[in-house]
Structures are given as structure tokens and as C-alpha cells.
Amino acid sequence: MNIDMNRFISILQFLTRIPIKRDVPMEEAFHKGIIYFPVVGGIIGALLMVAYRGASLYLAHSLSALLTVGFFVFLTGGLHLDGLGDTFDGLYSNRNKETILEIMKDSRLGTNGVLAMVFILLLKLYGIQGLGEHQIYWGIILMPVMGRQAIVYGCYRTIYGRSQGLGHLFIGKVSKKELLISSLLTFILAAMHLPSLIFALLLPIGSQLYKGHVMKKIDGMTGDTLGSLCELTEGCYLLFILLITGAGLF
């Protein structure tokens, strides 16, 4: 098996619970596999679309949307959702940098974290419910693509905010070439749905604004803040599609 395929499988195993019975060694250049983040997002989205389509054949639209969101959490192991909760607990605790990082590291979930997680899950649920017949399939497929590409932007030209953790695998290690490749893959996937392509073009700006906000708080990015960026991007993506289509622009 060549290096690129090894990296792709490693990233697929890292970001999902998809059972792949293959041992792939963690290489020193594991971070180079970040170019596959949007591709893995597309795989997740395709599986979500199949799940939604299957459920909608027998169940009401609202229940199908609920099961799709639940399957999304299961498929990813709640990896980024957990980061969202930890980030909101820490960043908005009104403490200093060291205390914020300690709070984010704590496995216990606080009020801010619970509220953030509930809000984003409800936003996804009602976002999927609100998508029209011509938007829902692309919306479901491309939502995970946008979230994972946002992580790539979040890792570029920044520093790691703590001494250890999963975030060190990617943060500050993304080259301009890797950024361009992953962005191109995202644009190719989004090109099949014009509202999504517009969102993809705006995504670097939004990601940079988020990154700047986090950097002011803790002087860097962490795995938790990347997870939060992913979840917030997915929610904003659905909201953007609803707003732009609701305005009759597409």
C-alpha cells in the first residue's frame, strides 16, 4: 500500500468510527494527510445522506432529520462535539489563559459546554428539517466537508496552545501546498451546489476570524478549539443555505 493511501486510511480512522480492519502505522508525517479532511467529510456526508434517504422512505421528515443528526454523532464518535463543549466551558469562563486551558482539559462538562452542544445539535436538526427538496441532499453531504475544511484553515499558520494533546498532530504543521490542495478539493465538491460554493469561498475568512478570537484568549489553537470550529462551521453552513435560499437567491 502506498504512502498516500496509508495517510488517507489513517485520516479516515482518525476522524470516524468507520470500521476498517487494517493496521496503518502512525508515521512522522501524519499531518500531511490533512489534505484528505474534506474527502473524509464527503464520505461522512454521503453516509448521512443514505441514512436520511433510507429513514425518509418510512418515517416523517422531522424524525428522519433527528436520526440523521444522531447518526452523525455516532459516526464521528462525538469527537468535535466534545471539543465544542470544552471550548465554550473554557473560553467563556472569564479566566486567565492557564485556567482556561485547565478547564478545557477537565473531562467534566459545565453549563456553557452543555448549552453550546444542545444549541448546535438543535441548529443541525432544525437546519436539516428546514432545507427544501432541492437543497437537502447537497446540504447533508457537504455539511461535514465544510466543517473539516475549516479545521485545515484553523491549523494553518498558528501555534499549539498547550504542551500536549491531539491538536499537536496538525496545528502549525500545515504547509501552503497542503492548504491549497484541501481547499481545491473542497471547491470541487462544493461546485456541484452553487450556494455551497459561495460558502466555501467565504469559509477562510470566517475561520480566520474565529482563530483570531481564540488566539486572543489562549495564544494558540488546541484540538478542542478545532473541534469547536468544525461544529460551528457546520451549523453556520446550514444556516447560510437556509438564508440564501429563503431569500430566493437560488
From Swiss-Prot:
<dbReference type="GO" id="GO:0008818">
    <property type="term" value="F:cobalamin 5'-phosphate synthase activity"/>
</dbReference>
<comment type="pathway">
    <text>Cofactor biosynthesis; adenosylcobalamin biosynthesis; adenosylcobalamin from cob(II)yrinate a,c-diamide: step 7/7.</text>
</comment>
<protein>
    <recommendedName>
        <fullName>Adenosylcobinamide-GDP ribazoletransferase</fullName>
        <ecNumber>2.7.8.26</ecNumber>
    </recommendedName>
</protein>
<comment type="similarity">
    <text>Belongs to the CobS family.</text>
</comment>
<feature type="transmembrane region" description="Helical">
    <location>
        <begin position="32"/>
        <end position="52"/>
    </location>
</feature>
<feature type="transmembrane region" description="Helical">
    <location>
        <begin position="185"/>
        <end position="205"/>
    </location>
</feature>
<keyword id="KW-1003">Cell membrane</keyword>
<dbReference type="InterPro" id="IPR003805">
    <property type="entry name" value="CobS"/>
</dbReference>
<keyword id="KW-0460">Magnesium</keyword>
<dbReference type="GO" id="GO:0009236">
    <property type="term" value="P:cobalamin biosynthetic process"/>
</dbReference>
<keyword id="KW-0169">Cobalamin biosynthesis</keyword>
<feature type="transmembrane region" description="Helical">
    <location>
        <begin position="113"/>
        <end position="133"/>
    </location>
</feature>
<feature type="transmembrane region" description="Helical">
    <location>
        <begin position="230"/>
        <end position="250"/>
    </location>
</feature>
<keyword id="KW-1133">Transmembrane helix</keyword>
<dbReference type="GO" id="GO:0005886">
    <property type="term" value="C:plasma membrane"/>
</dbReference>
<feature type="transmembrane region" description="Helical">
    <location>
        <begin position="59"/>
        <end position="79"/>
    </location>
</feature>
<comment type="function">
    <text>Joins adenosylcobinamide-GDP and alpha-ribazole to generate adenosylcobalamin (Ado-cobalamin). Also synthesizes adenosylcobalamin 5'-phosphate from adenosylcobinamide-GDP and alpha-ribazole 5'-phosphate.</text>
</comment>
<keyword id="KW-0812">Transmembrane</keyword>
<dbReference type="GO" id="GO:0051073">
    <property type="term" value="F:adenosylcobinamide-GDP ribazoletransferase activity"/>
</dbReference>
<dbReference type="Pfam" id="PF02654">
    <property type="entry name" value="CobS"/>
</dbReference>
<keyword id="KW-0472">Membrane</keyword>
<keyword id="KW-0808">Transferase</keyword>
<feature type="transmembrane region" description="Helical">
    <location>
        <begin position="136"/>
        <end position="156"/>
    </location>
</feature>
